[in-house]
Amino acid sequence: MWGSPALAWAVWLACVQPTVFPWSLSFRSDTDKPSSAAEVLTEASSCWTDTVECFSDYMTLWIPRSHVEGLRRWLARTLHLPGTWRSPDHLDSSLAKCGYFLHLASDGDFLFRVQYSACFVQKEKANYRLEIRIFQKGVMGLERSDRYIMKCPMLRSRLGQESVHCGPMFIQVSRPLPLWRDNRQTPWLLSLRGELVASLEDASLMGLYVDMNATTVTVQSPRQGLLQRWEVLNTSAELLPLWLVSGHHAYSLEAACPPVSFQPESEVLVHIPKQRLGLVKRGSYIEETLSLRFLRVHQSNIFMVTENKDFVVVSIPAAGVLQVQRCQEVGGTPGTQAFYRVDLSLEFAEMAAPVLWTVESFFQCVGSGTESPASTAALRTTPSPPSPGPETPPAGVPPAASSQVWAAGPAAQEWLSRDLLHRPSDALAKKGLGPFLQTAKPARRGQTSASILPRVVQAQRGPQPPPGEAGIPGHPTPPATLPSEPVEGVQASPWRPRPVLPTHPALTLPVSSDASSPSPPAPRPERPESLLVSGPSVTLTEGLGTVRPEQDPAKSPGSPLLLRGLSSGDVAAPEPIMGEPGQASEEFQPLARPWRATLAAEELVSHRSPGEPQETCSGTEVERPRQTGPGLPREGARGHMDLSSSEPSQDIEGPGLSILPARDATFSTPSVRQPDPSAWLSSGPELTGMPRVRLAAPLAVLPMEPLPPEPVRPAALLTPEASSVGGPDQARYLESAPGWPVGQEEWGVAHTSSPPSTQTLSLWAPTGVLLPSLVELEYPFQAGRGASLQQELTEPTLALSAESHRPPELQDSVEGLSERPSR
C-alpha cells in the first residue's frame, strides 16, 4: 500500500525532470527562473536585467563554467579566428583586442566583461546593446544556441573627475556622486583597504569625515594612521586606499599626496593611481593595467611623465605652479605657506571618458623665525613687496590682511580679488568636520614651446647690516603688491635666506624730475653676481615721474635687467598730499620673501638716442640749469611717481622695466614733457625732513655697447674712470646694454641735442648709514614662466654696478616742488 504511491512518484520525476530543464543556465539569484530548451532568452525575458550588471565603462554577464566553452566557440566563430588561436590562452588575448574579457571567479565560474567600445556593441537611443550566443555542447549551429541580450543605459553623469587636496594634517578627496538608473539603490558604504567596511554614519569612528549631497561626495582623512606609504619610481607618495561600495558596485576615492614638507623642491610631483574612476564591479580584484594615451598639464607646457602598472607620475617645474600665501602657525605667529594647484587631463585606452585630475598641495606654514619655504623653489611669482623690517612694521603702517594670497601668472588678479581664507563649508561644519579649504580656479596659460628653464644666478653670501637701520622714521610705507607678470631663469643658491615677513598691498614711489639715484655702497669686486629679471613693459613718464605698465598687448614684453649692487636701505615713501591729482598705479604680485629695501641708493642709467652721450647720475633730486624752449619745464621742476592710483598721466613710452623684489623704489626721470599733455598732468607731494647730498662735479659718461648673443653672464667690470670727488677710490664700474630702438614718437622731446648739464643730487638717507646692496642681500628668487630664453638673450639688458662710495657732502636742506608752467 505505502510502496505504490512512492514508486509512482519516483517514476514520474524520472520521466518529467530531464525534459523540462534540458539547457538552462543556473542563476544565483533566487528570483531568476530557468527557461526550457524550446525557449531562448530575449529582451522580453526577465533574466537579462538580473544577470547583466552595468558600470561606467563596461557591462558584465555571469557565465557558469558549464557554459563557458559554448561562449568561447561562438566568440571564435564570430571573430573569425583560425583554429590554432581557439585555445583558451590565445583566445583571451584576441578577445582583449576587441574589448571582451573572460575573468575566472573564485568559485570556478566566469565573468564575461564587455566594454562599451567593444566590437559589435551597438548604441541605440540611450542604451548600449550587445547580442551574444552560447552554443550547446556538441552543437555548432545557431539553431541550437541560447541567445542573450546585454543591455545597459548610457550614464549621464561624468564620473571621470577627482579633486585632491593635500594639506599638512589631512587629505581631502571630492568626486561626483554616481546617479543610479533605477530606485533600487542600496546604501553607500566605506571600504578601507578593501577590508574594513563601515556605514557613512560610522565613518567618524575611523577618523573620516564625509559630506555627501545630491551630486558630490567629499571625504576628509587625517594623514596619521590611514595612509599607506608607497615608493613609486624613486619617489614617495602617501596613498588613501578608500572606496565607496554599494551592492555589486564600487567607486574609487583613492588619492595620493606627497609627504609633508616645509620646503618645496625644484619640481613638484603628482601621483595618479592607475584605476577606473567610474563605477566598477565590487568583489574580486581584477588585474588590469590601464594604458595612458594622452596627458596634458593645464598650468605648464614643461613636464615629464613616468608610469608603472600602478601609478602615473608627472613631474612639473615648480617655477610654473608654485605660489605663496599668508598663514598662521599654531601659536598665532604669522608666516608664509607655499602651495601649488595642478590640473591634468588624461586619457586611457581602456576608458570611455577622459579623466580630469586636480591636485592642491600645501606645505607647512613657516614662521618669521625659520627659513622661507620659497627659498629653495622656483616660485611662479614676481619679486616680493617691501617688508617693513625684520619683525615689526613702522609706525602708522596697518598690518596686511591675513587672507591675502600671493599668486602669479594669468590667475593673479583672480587670486587677489577673492577671499581665500580657509573656512569650513556649511555642510561639513554641521557634521563637525575639519577645515574645508576653498580652491581657486587654475591659472590656464597659453600654449608655448617647451624649454628648459635657464639657471643664471649663483649667489654668494656677504656680510650685511641689519635691515631697517637705513629707514627714515616718521614716513610710513604704504602696502604693496607686485606685478603678476612672471619672471624666468633664476636658480636658487645654497645659502639659507632670511625669513619671509608680511608685506602690504600698495607701493608709492616718490621721485624727482630727473633720472638719478644716490651713490651706491662701497665696491665689492670679489663678489661678482648677475641677476636676470624679466618683467612687464613699463612706461616711464619723464617730467612727471610716473611708472605704469604698457597697455598695448602688441608691444614686446619688458627687457630683462641685469642689476648689481642695488641697495636695500629702508627709505619710506610719503603719503600723497590731499587734493593732488591721482597718480598712475600698477598692481604687482609679490614673491614669498619680502624685503625692506629701496632703490634710494641704486644706480639708474638714463637712455638717450643713439647719437647722443649717455648720462649717469646718482641721487633722488636733481636741479637743472634753466632751459627754454617748447615742451621743457621751468627750472627745478620735479615729478612724483606713485603706483597707488589708476589715473593716467603724461608718459613717453620707453624700454621695458622690471622692478626687483619688494623694494620701495625711488626713481627719477629727465625733466621733459610731451607736446599737449594737458589731460594727464599731475603733481606729487612735497617731501620734508629729507637730507640732501650734493656732488661738486658731474659723473662720468660711458657709451652704450651691444651685448653679444650668448647666454647671460655676470656683469663684467670695465676700466674705472676716477671721479672728481673722492679720487680713484670712488671709481665707478658700469656696463650698460645696447639702447632700446627708440623713435622720436616714443621719446618725444626727451632726446634733444642739448649737452648734459651739471646736476645737484640729494640722498634720502641718514648720514653715516651704509645701505646694504643686493649683492649683500643675495636673495635668490626664482621666476615663473615669463619670456623665453631666446627672447631674453635678444632683448637689451641693463647692468648696474654699485661699487663706489657715497658722496661725503650731506646737507639738510629741502626744496619744495615748483609750479609747472602755465599753458
UniProtKB/Swiss-Prot annotation:
One Pfam family here: DUF4556
Keywords, sorted A to Z: Disease variant, Heterotaxy, Secreted, Signal
Described purpose of this protein according to its UniProt entry: Plays a role in left-right patterning process.
Region annotation Disordered: where it falls in the sequence: 206-242, 269-422, 434-520, 632-656
Compositional bias segments (type: Pro residues): 216-230
Organism: Homo sapiens
Cellular compartments annotated: Secreted
Matching PANTHER family: GENE 572-RELATED
Keyword Secreted: yes
Keyword Secreted attributed: yes
Pathological association: Heterotaxy, visceral, 14, autosomal: A form of visceral heterotaxy, a complex disorder due to disruption of the normal left-right asymmetry of the thoracoabdominal organs. Visceral heterotaxy or situs ambiguus results in randomization of the placement of visceral organs, including the heart, lungs, liver, spleen, and stomach. The organs are oriented randomly with respect to the left-right axis and with respect to one another. It can be associated with a variety of congenital defects including cardiac malformations. HTX14 inheritance is autosomal recessive.
The protein's name: Ciliated left-right organizer ZP-N domains-containing protein
Result when mutating residue 19 to M: In HTX14; uncertain significance
Primary localization class, coarse: secreted
GO terms, biological process: establishment of left/right asymmetry
A single cellular component GO annotation: extracellular region
Feature: compositional bias, Low complexity: 389-402
Signal peptide region: 1-22
Xref: InterPro entries: C1orf127-like, DUF4556
